[in-house]
Amino acid sequence: KEKTKEKIFEKHLLKKDELVMEVETTKEEETLDDKIANDLIKKQGFFDPTLELSKFKMPNLDLLKNYGETGIKINQEELEANKNKIVETLNNYKIGISNIKATIGPTVTLYEIVPDAGIRISKIKSLEDDIALSLSALGIRIIAPIPGKGTIGIEVPNQNPTVVSMRSVITSTKFQNAEMELPIALGKTISNETFVVDLVKMPHLLMAGATGQGKSVGLNAVLTSLIFKKHPAEVKFVLVDPKKVELNIYSKIERHYLAKLPDTEEAIITDNTKVINTLNSLCIEMDNRYELLKNAMCRNIKEYNLKFKQRKLNPKDGHNYLPYIILVVDEFADLIMTAGKEVETPIARLAQLARAIGIHLIIATQRPSVNVITGIIKANFPARIAFRVASKIDSRTILDSGGADQLIGRGDMLYTQGNELTRIQCAFVDTPEVESISSFVGGQTGYSQAHLLPEYSGEENNSSIEIDPSERDSLFREAAEVIVTAQQGSASLLQRKLKLGYNRAGRIIDQMEAAGVVGPFEGSKARQVLISD
């Protein structure tokens, strides 16, 4: 058998030798642009955006405090007592439990119960206040059922909550190994896991909650996460702070991480008129970036920057490396009250379009009601954080569901990204910690100036050209006399004196500005009257 096998094999070889076929593989032709790019890579390597600040050192973890907490302390007596009270309360209402399990978090313990067959979930849900009474505890929340599990959850606050330090969150492997474009470490979940999300995938974030519940600390946690993870060449912040004291602490990092308008002294924007110009400037930047992406045939900023690093885009054609720009607004309601539509329109444009070109919005407000955040803006903020609020209505306004009214405050928050709610204890960043990070970054060599946004000149300068004197209102002369006599350029004055509607009074004021009777818009102040009585 072996011999016959060898003979067959020899015959096969002979046949193969008789018909020798050469196979020629065709190579894809290299385009001129690819050839130039490959030659440049051979000579200089890939483009490195961090090269200009190559000696820049990322902040040290020693700048963050530890608060002396090594882990969660388990109080067995408290767990047993709570379990007995939950079982007893449910038994009083003839609700039997076949299984109970406790998961201990930093501030809250989750008791997962499996009710006996035939028990209606709504019956357990209606006993929320009774369970709270029996446990003598605030902030009890019932999750019925827990998504993805066949259990009902009862969240009970711990008697001795653990402080979640920013250091413990940033040193976690989940954050350190996060392969995300813009990773944000928000804090720890009920199961004591570090909660890390990608701002690019959000793509905008809405934070809301009552005064003193942790919004500003939450903003600091977001900014600290990005400063610890991203080089100044990769991310820029536009900080809007109507309160003037919350974000002022970041002024030291102006030449590293901040972006501003040309010819403005301070990078942190506190004046409402400058906010309008900055937002419109960001819209111009957005349009410019979309034009660059269109010319480079890319769909988003990640593809574009990768192409630029591979030297496939020529800087002579206007191409350059695009950093992510993050707009942070600390108290949005104040802007809407003072500037209204002038702020709303650019914010809505940015919320709808800016995600693909790397401009992301983080807006904090006390209560995002319809008059503060319109439906168009809110629809573009699927990622929302709710700190403690006063009522169920406020909770529904933020999250479109209840729950935020049952939080216990001090950084206890609910996070949603269009699906189920996740309860998180926000990482605590103290003011001295933020100051030391800002000083560490600010003490290093930075760029010659802050990242400059495109110049924007307000439209009010062109109003004299736009309005034709023949189209003036029939009450223009009478209105001008009222304004000059009162020496107060306000539309509300015309509404009262001449019994006009708001729109007509506003149009007359614009016509007066064009005629040189009153000065330009100055936010919440009345316009200056340029003609004396």
Range-by-range predicted roles:
Residues 101-111, 140-158, 296-312, 319-322, ...:
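Glycine/charge-rich, flexible interdomain linkers and switch-proximal surface loops
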Residues 419-484:
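AAA+ P-loop ATPase motor domain of ring mechanoenzymes
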Residues 1-206, 395, 533:
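Low-complexity, intrinsically disordered P/S/T-rich segments
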Residues 96, 458-533:
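Terminal-proximal interaction/regulatory segments of ATP-powered molecular machines
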Residues 55, 59, 146-151, 155, ...:
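P-loop NTPase catalytic phosphate-binding loop
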Residues 142, 388, 392, 448-456:
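Interdomain boundary/hinge elements
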Residues 295-296, 411-413, 450-457, 493-497:
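Short coil/turn segments at secondary-structure boundaries
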Residues 114-117, 368-369, 496-501:
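Conserved short loop/turn motifs at secondary-structure junctions
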